[in-house]
């Protein structure tokens, strides 16, 4: 994945959306717009979207950020889906070798409902070095950007956060 990309998907805007790798500083700039108070516990990769108005050459205004994190070792829905035993060591090894977790997707309120979250998720999936990308989100049952980015919602307890999985190996089939 290149360090700087754009897409025609947002051609209706009076400027350009630029996607590039980000930093934890970028995350902190938008974190107040997320429903979870604490930042992610780990950071494997950060993707940001910046809006540059037509005719400007500035770095652009930060409008979205997504964080790819190292997975937690024990996740019940994952264990059931992959038929994993309940011991910590096996789960930790499987998770670290095969998964990364999309832990945050934040879009500035002025730029919501135009597909930026879906595009950030797609780019996090593309940047991920592992065969699987997962996400677990309380709002996932209502905000459909994970499924519109190609992730599959795995049935889980309706009282728990929704669980999503993307199998990068299925792209090659």
Language model: regions and residue ranges:
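Terminal substrate-recognition subdomain of acyl/acetyltransferases
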Residues: 1-104, 125-173
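Conserved acetyl-CoA-binding loop-helix of GNAT-fold acetyltransferases
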Residues: 107-126
